[in-house]
Regions:
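Flavin-dependent oxidoreductase catalytic cores
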Residues: 50-415
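A residue-level signal for beta-strand positions that form part of recognition/binding surfaces
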Residues: 11, 28-31, 62, 73
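Active-site donor-binding loop signature of nucleotide-sugar glycosyltransferases
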Residues: 19-22, 34-36
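Short glycine/proline-enriched turn or capping motifs at secondary-structure junctions
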Residues: 22-29, 399-401
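Intrinsically disordered or compositionally simple regulatory linkers and C-terminal tails
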Residues: 34-53
Length: 415
């Protein structure tokens, strides 16, 4: 436990952590939507923020999952870098992940790493589908472990019907026919009018991919990763099985939520069987599809219960990106209520993600038990040393910078 006392002068800021001071928020409640196309606001959004006395900075308290102990509650979200060559990561990934680890983040999660070549979003996506990928990832992992006390996870996934596209800064649209590859999905439904129609998966496809996930887990262990996250959100392959908008199967893999969860659970069990018992597994889900007829938060609670019963250690609670319809414009912390409800009702630890801002927000999320960990993506793109800067801002005592950067702890920025 860090020997830091939360300053009394911060108390009022702490109590009112949830609403960002931007328009769209009201005192003690959350107003999420602008425009008219969004579905109705789930009833649990309208609730008073609980108040609780604080004496310490919750952001800088440790947290354990199985044999992995994190020094604080900050996680770097997996973010596709589109910088690999034939699936092999390189110096960019060493710097990208290594700098955030050196910057004080407790857990850095590598981008969605595809378990088969047809599962790539683009030609430049990272992979763990052939033996030569493992040593390249090991170089990244070794750097993080050698030069920081951070832990490093890998997000394993398959893009499904959202595969075979240009990289983000080239428009992210479907590749032309002479560069494209076949895509697969639970049902033959294209992601957008311009997208390739995926082939509906057979049982043989499922068995092949279950083994691909298992092999990727074995290589991830050889590379030294501390955690695996399964990408089960955002409209990629596993997410497409879960959502009723994208799974129209009439066999045992479609229909009821129990059936739609069959393939995700088969993947999880295969990974768990090939991953050390003392190392945790996470899964990212889209808890709310932002579309009529899609996944609702009640479903997310049930998913949390199923995954907890199967042995999942923590649920990374995101939302949306399942369909081509744009997500409604939202304010900060718009997904935290999903995490809070799943955590409370499913009884499983959660990570929250989505427009998480300053350290006061993170302190509030942890103290109010809305999530156990806070994922930050764009914020850590902007500031790789967010954790160090937060510790300085909060006045955390005995905070340790990397030895090479120790003098920075004495720097006092001028506003």
């Amino acid at each position: 436990m860090l020997g830091h006392m939360w300053r009394a002068a911060k108390a009022s800021k702490f109590v009112t952590w949830a609403p960002c001071p931007s328009k769209g928020w009201t005192s003690g409640a959350i107003s999420l939507f602008s425009g008219t196309r969004a579905p109705p606001v789930p009833s649990f959004f309208h609730q008073t923020i609980r108040k609780r006395p604080m004496t310490e900075a919750p952001m800088f308290t440790p947290f354990s999952l199985r044999g992995m102990t994190l020094k604080n509650r900050l996680v770097m979200s997996p973010m596709c870098q589109y910088s690999a060559e034939d699936g092999t990561v390189n110096d960019w990934h060493v710097v990208h992940l290594g700098s955030r680890a050196m910057g004080g983040t407790a857990l850095v999660i590598a981008e969605m790493t595809d378990v088969s070549p047809e599962g790539r979003i683009s030609h430049k996506c990272a992979g763990m589908y052939k033996p030569e990928h493992m040593p390249a990832w090991k170089r990244v992992v070794d750097f993080v472990h050698t030069h920081s006390d951070a832990k490093i996870g890998i997000q394993l996934g398959h893009a499904g019907r959202k595969a075979s596209c240009h990289v983000q800064w080239e428009g992210a649209g479907p590749l032309p026919a002479d560069q494209a590859w076949e895509t697969i999905a639970p049902s033959a439904l294209p992601f957008s009018p311009d997208s390739q129609t995926p082939r509906e998966m057979t049982r043989a496809d499922m068995e092949r991919l279950i083994e691909a996930y298992a092999q990727a887990a074995r290589w991830s262990e050889q590379a030294g990763f501390d955690m695996i996250e399964i990408h089960g959100g955002h409209g990629y392959l596993i997410s497409s099985f879960i959502s009723p908008l994208t799974n129209k199967r009439t066999d045992e893999y479609g229909g009821s939520l129990e059936n739609r969860m069959r393939f995700p659970l088969e993947v999880f069990h295969a990974i768990r069987a090939n991953w050390p018992e003392d190392k945790p597994i996470s899964m990212r889900i889209s808890a709310f599809d932002w579309a009529e007829g899609g996944t609702e938060v009640d479903d997310a609670v049930e998913i949390g219960k199923m995954m907890k019963a199967a042995g999942l250690d923590i649920l990374d609670v995101s939302s949306g990106n399942v369909t081509n319809d744009p997500r409604p414009r939202v304010e900060g912390l718009f997904q935290t209520p999903f995490s809070e409800r799943v955590r409370a009702e499913a009884g499983i630890p959660t990570m929250t993600v989505g427009n998480v801002g300053g350290p006061e927000q993170i302190n509030g999320i942890i103290a109010e038990e809305r999530a156990d960990l806070c994922c930050m993506a764009k914020g850590q793109m902007f500031d790789p040393y967010f954790a160090h800067h937060a510790a300085q801002k909060l006045g955390v005592e005995d905070y340790k910078w990397p030895n090479q950067y120790g003098a920075a702890g004495f720097f006092k920025p001028v506003d």
